[in-house]
């Protein structure tokens, strides 16, 4: 009885997406409880990235509903969904320092310089990269770049964090360390 009344934080209902003749997703249905960490499993080309991009608002489904915190978000732009997204290739700006990469979303949101400085310093400490604020991505290891990508996604305080194979380009030892670190951060911050 209690489970039936439980409201999912994220729900996908009958999501369909095609690219020409290719069906990237077909009647996808699932829900995610608030504060939970889940993974989408499937072979290459099965539509996992497409689903994440639709939840984020970077692509629109052909049909179906995406519901976040009780609201249908199909027509809400990505910038208004309150979602952090970490891409497989990090997507860091190579000509921006660690500080500026992390601050990017906050500047877009037009936060005050004081707030940006405090928030970025807090995140740099959280990811364990104190003293590296002025380095560029090319001066960092793969694991450090990935932590900067996580910090950038977390900077605007998203309620939902989407990760698209964030550990694929990292060696096995660092991958395991980052997985443990990320799980701990997500629990600490209460992000879904």
What are these regions (language model features)?
Residues 41-43:
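The feature captures the beta-strand-to-loop junction immediately N-terminal to the Walker
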Residues 64-72:
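Conserved ABC transporter NBD signature motif
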């Amino acid at each position: 009885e209690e489970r039936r009344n439980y409201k999912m934080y994220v729900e996908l209902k009958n999501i369909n997406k095609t690219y020409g003749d290719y069906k990237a997703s077909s009647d996808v249905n699932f829900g995610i409880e608030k504060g939970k960490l889940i993974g989408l499993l499937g072979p290459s080309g099965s539509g996992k990235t497409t689903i994440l991009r639709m939840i984020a608002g970077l692509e629109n489904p052909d049909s179906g509903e995406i519901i976040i915190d009780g609201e249908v978000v199909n027509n809400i732009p990505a910038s208004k969904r309150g979602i952090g997204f970490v891409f497989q290739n990090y997507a860091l700006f190579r000509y921006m320092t660690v500080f500026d990469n992390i601050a990017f979303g906050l500047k877009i949101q037009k936060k005050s310089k004081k707030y940006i400085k405090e928030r970025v310093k807090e995140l740099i400490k959280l990811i364990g990269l104190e003293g590296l604020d002025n380095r560029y991505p090319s001066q960092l290891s793969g694991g450090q770049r990935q932590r900067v990508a996580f910090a950038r996604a977390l900077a605007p305080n998203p309620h939902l964090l989407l990760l698209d194979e964030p550990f694929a380009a990292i060696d096995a030892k660092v991958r395991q360390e980052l997985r443990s670190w990320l799980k701990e951060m997500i629990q600490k911050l209460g992000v879904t």
